[in-house]
């Protein structure tokens, strides 16, 4: 018997004896680790086993409680209609467990949200950093105050122009990463208790930001092939007083979906009809595999309602945390919000990136990076097809560095995550990508780490673990459901 199974049995005995009556809160993960001398992964796995059996149930942000009776674990559909009342967001503790795994150097970081440092121009960025530090004076440090270093904003404006868009320098606000740009945008557009429309699934950091802002969400499904369900969005806009939408329309994280140009035009027109702003997360736009970049929704904006948020963290310098917002009519308010929060993004980082964009061969680097990522995606998809169960599906994206994997519907991705972690591999389980913990048989994998032999071995291990989890799930819940 495995350690987590023994721990689960011990808790069942406590429940049977009445030490933990129905409705009682069971020990927190941290308390259980101390009491039984086990790791957080062991406790999580024991608790999820008990949850699957209906012995305990989770309450968001409160912990686990002994059930009054058996509960059924929902199997969420990636295209489930969103016609439900707005709800508060409570980010699972599992998100933070996933984030911890990517910091462990011995772990294969397929659950990471970042590219491998081996793919980035670290030495060339370092040269730019050294150059600007030699020439900078203390008085120039104030040049980075909101709206940000003008030379950097000019370079960003130039890149918009190269993409066929005219974005004035005065509408660009530099932030400490794109997440801050989007969070500040949501903050200035809403008040606690307001309704915001988000994607399902969506990036877990968006959920964390929305939880901090105490907003209620309506989730709109994103199909890996078709993109966003605009019919569902239209119903939500008619039914609720929506203050903003927060969408990623190109190379969506985690599904890889891209909304077509006609879809983006329809999205912008629909929101303009209701005078609802769009916070557009476009951090992967530079990582397109085709000959031309994808047009963002901002391209079709004629009313200044789209706040277009970008970043250099995903494709150039993650540690510098430099992002921006092309904020349209909201630029002055966003600049003021930046003043009142973190004040300024790092001035040396702003200057270094501006220097690199002007002198460092950014386009040559991106051309090489795109080619490498396209090859690595092909390698990962090939490995998944060879090693995973036959009814596994994985998305092929036209950019970015994620694939969204649909496992057999009787596989629990949280159990799979814990098993993978035990084998030294980090993955991102589906439940962290939605407000209600759905997508229990989905995982996100990162193909942004080079090394075909290491990648192949890791995917082979995951495939074997998936087969084991399939058999385990079958033993726990009975025969697999027919397809």
Listing of model-derived features with the role each one plays in the protein:
Residues 433-437:
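AMP-binding (ANL) adenylation modules
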Residues 134-274, 279, 285-303, 373, ...:
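Conserved core of the PLP fold type I
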Residues 1-130, 335, 339-346, 367, ...:
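N-terminal basic, amphipathic alpha-helical segments
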Residues 3, 83-177, 184, 358, ...:
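N-terminal small-domain helix-loop-helix segment of the aminotransferase-like
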Residues 354, 366-392:
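Conserved PLP-dependent catalytic core of the aminotransferase class-I/II
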Residues 302-371:
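Conserved core segment of the aminotransferase class I/II
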């Amino acid at each position: 018997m495995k350690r987590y199974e023994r721990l689960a049995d011990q808790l069942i005995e406590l429940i049977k004896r009445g030490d933990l009556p129905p409705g009682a809160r069971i020990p927190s993960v941290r308390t259980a680790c101390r009491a039984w001398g086990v790791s957080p992964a062991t406790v999580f796995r024991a608790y999820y086993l008990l949850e699957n059996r209906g012995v305990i149930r989770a309450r968001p942000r409160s912990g686990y409680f002994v059930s009054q009776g058996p509960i059924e674990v929902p199997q969420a559909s990636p295209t489930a209609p969103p016609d439900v009342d707005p709800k508060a967001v409570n980010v699972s503790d599992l998100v933070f467990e996933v984030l911890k795994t990517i910091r462990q150097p011995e772990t294969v970081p397929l659950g990471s949200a970042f590219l491998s440092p081996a793919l980035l121009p670290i030495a060339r960025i370092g040269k730019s950093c050294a150059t600007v530090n030699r020439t900078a004076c203390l008085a120039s440090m104030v040049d980075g105050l909101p709206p940000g270093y003008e030379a950097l904003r000019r370079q960003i404006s130039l890149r918009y122009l190269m993409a066929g868009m005219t974005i004035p320098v005065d509408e660009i606000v530099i932030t400490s990463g794109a997440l801050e740009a989007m969070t500040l945008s949501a903050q200035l557009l809403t008040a606690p208790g307001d309704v915001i429309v988000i994607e399902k699934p969506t990036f877990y950091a968006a959920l964390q930001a929305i939880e901090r802002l105490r907003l209620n969400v309506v989730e709109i499904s994103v199909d890996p092939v078709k993109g966003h369900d605009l019919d569902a969005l239209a119903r939500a806009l008619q039914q609720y007083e929506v203050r903003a939408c927060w969408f990623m329309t190109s190379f969506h994280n985690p599904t890889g979906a891209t909304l077509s140009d006609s879809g983006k035009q329809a999205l912008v027109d629909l929101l303009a009809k209701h005078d609802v702003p769009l916070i557009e997360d476009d951090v992967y736009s530079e990582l397109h595999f085709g000959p031309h970049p994808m047009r963002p929704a901002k391209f079709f904006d004629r009313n200044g309602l789209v706040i277009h948020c970008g970043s250099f963290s995903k494709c150039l310098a993650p540690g510098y945390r430099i992002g921006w917002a092309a904020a349209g009519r909201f630029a002055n308010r966003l600049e003021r919000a930046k003043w009142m929060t973190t004040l300024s993004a790092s001035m040396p980082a702003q200057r270094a990136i501006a220097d690199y964009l002007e002198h460092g061969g950014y386009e040559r680097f991106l051309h090489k990076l795109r080619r490498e990522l396209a090859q690595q995606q092909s390698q990962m998809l090939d490995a998944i097809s060879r090693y995973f169960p036959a009814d596994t599906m994985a998305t092929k994206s036209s950019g970015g560095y994620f694939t969204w994997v649909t496992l057999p519907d009787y596989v629990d991705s949280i159990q799979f995550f814990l098993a993978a972690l035990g084998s030294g591999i980090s993955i991102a389980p589906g439940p962290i990508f939605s407000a209600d913990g759905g997508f229990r048989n989905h995982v996100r994998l990162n193909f942004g780490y080079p090394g075909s032999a290491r990648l192949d071995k890791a995917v082979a291990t995951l495939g074997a673990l998936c087969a084991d989890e399939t058999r385990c799930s079958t033993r726990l819940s009975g025969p697999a459901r027919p397809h």
